[in-house]
Regions:
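Cytosolic, long alpha-helical scaffolding segments
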Residues: 1-6, 12-202
């Protein structure tokens, strides 16, 4: 606080830059840690000869994958809608690139989980087959919904169409907040493995 008071604008810029750098580094470390843990789970699924253990690891892998999909959807939904509201084409292009990477990731994850499904008890695999494909399709639908949202927003801003009238903004902003809060709540339930309030969420 004293540095900002005596240093003025330059000190404030330095503090903001350091804060942003710290947040970026923390985010990168967290992603690396999650990726390493995710890879360890996959290795465990592929090396274990205990079918019950493979099933336990597969459930964990799928839960982590779904949580990652919801987290990605949260941030990308915010990025797309911010880009539309602020007429920020760079933000929309960044979201579009991120969606391209997410599509490839979903394909890799699904292939890995299909391999693990072949290593669990056959009767259990038949029983859980619908559950498995429903979970995979949920992640894909999140991706396609975001893609379909991003394309017209990018076209609208990129072609310099008129900004949204304020009357539309007043209608859109509460809906945006509800959708974002829904995704946050779903992720919380998955993280805590607590689905007792699922009916109220739905």
């Amino acid at each position: 606080a004293l540095a900002i008071y005596y240093g003025g604008t330059i000190a404030m810029v330095v503090v903001v830059a350091l804060t942003i750098l710290f947040l970026i580094r923390s985010n990168i470390r967290y992603r690396r840690k999650m990726k390493a843990e995710h890879d360890d789970v996959f290795k465990g699924m592929m090396t274990s000869r205990d079918k019950a253990e493979v099933w336990t690891l597969l459930r964990r892998h799928m839960t982590e994958s779904l949580m990652a999909s919801v987290t990605f959807a949260e941030s990308t939904f915010r990025q797309i809608t911010d880009g539309l509201l602020k007429e920020d084409i760079k933000s929309l292009r960044k979201a579009e690139r991120a969606l391209g990477g997410e599509k490839d990731l979903l394909k890799r994850v699904r292939r890995r989980q299909m391999l693990a499904m072949r290593r669990i008890d056959r009767n259990l695999a038949l029983e859980k087959n619908t559950w498995f494909h429903t979970a995979s399709n949920a992640s894909e639908q999140l991706y396609y919904c975001l893609k379909r949202l991003c394309e017209p927003c990018k076209e609208h801003v990129g072609n310099n169409f008129n900004p949204m009238p304020k009357v539309y903004l007043r209608e859109f902003l509460p809906i945006r907040t509800r959708i974002f809060n829904l995704m946050v709540e779903i992720r919380r339930m998955m993280e805590q493995n607590d689905y007792s309030d699922i009916q109220n969420v739905l």
